[in-house]
Every structure is written in C-alpha cells, then in structure tokens.
Amino acid sequence: MANPFSKGWKYLMQSLDTKIEENADPHVQIQQATEAARKQHQQISESAARVIGNRNQLEMKMNRLQQDAQKLSDNARTAIQQADKAAAAGDQTKANELNQTAELFASQLVTVEQELDETKQLYAGAEEAARQAQQQQQQSAARLEEQMSQINQLRSQAVSYTHLTLPTSVPV
C-alpha cells in the first residue's frame, strides 16, 4: 500500500515544479510585469482624478457661495433703502418690517461668508493636492512609458531567445 504522505509530497513537488516553470517562462514574466505596470498607473490615475474632482467640487461650491453672498448683500441693501424711504414717508410699521428683513438677510450673509471662508481654506489645500496629484500622474505616465519600452525590448529578446533554443529540425 502506498504511503499517503509520499503521494502528497510528490504532488506538492510536481505542483511547485509546474509553478516554477510557469514563472520561469519569460513570456509569463513579461506579461506579469506589463499588467503590474498598467495596474499601478491606473491606480495613480484614479487617485489623481478623485483629488482633482474634489478640488473642482470645492471650486463650484465656492462660486455658488460667492453668488449667494452677493445676492444676500444686495437684498439687505435694498431692504435698508426701502426701510429708509418708508421711514421718510412716515410709515414706521413698514420701516420696522423692512429693517427686520434687512437684519435677517445680514445674518444669513454672515453665515454664508463664514462658510465661504471655510470653503476657500479647503479649496487652497485641495488645489495644492490636485497639483501634486497631477504631477504624480504625469510621472506615472512617464514611468509607464519607460517600463513599456523596456518590456517591449524584453519581448523582442524573449522571441529571439525562443527562436535560438528551439530546434530547427526534429530528427525522425
């Protein structure tokens, strides 16, 4: 009766031999290097896109807040002017209502300006991060191009090597 440990050991050794042969094949190694280089570049590009997208979202938010602040400022100014006209005309009730409206616009303006200041600070950081991410992406693209050039050289060498090692005629 065969020893199960011996059979397992032989199976393991055969499996390892197969793996070594697969990995020793230059074509497999070249393919693995190609996939790894492309995957790394893809990850860097996706990360850069997220960082740049964040910056763009902050820029849009900042623009919207600036427009809101301008609108609230205009509304507060208009309410004050109308309150002054109402007071000059002797309508104190309407003047008080318009002054309260102006105060409401002013308090909203303060809130929007605070949010705008916070967004500007976030945007400054995001802009620097986007610049760095863009540089990293460009460096990654250059690295990928260089790696692909080296990989193409290896492929041509592997093809040459394969042609040299294969027998040209098989004895019969």
Question: What feature does the model see in each segment?
Answer:
Residues M1-E22, V28:
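Extended, charged low-complexity scaffolding/tethering segments
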Residues Y11, A36, Q43, K71, ...:
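Charged, amphipathic alpha-helical oligomerization/scaffolding segments
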Residues K19-Q57, Q121-L122, A126:
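Short, charge-rich amphipathic alpha-helices with coiled-coil/heptad character
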Residues E59-E97:
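Extended alpha-helical coiled-coil "stalk/arm" regions
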Residues L104-G125:
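Amphipathic alpha-helical coiled-coil segments
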Residues T162-T168:
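Conserved small/polar residues in nucleotide/adenosyl-binding loops
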Residues V170-V172:
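Acidic, Ala/Val/Gly-enriched low-complexity intrinsically disordered segments
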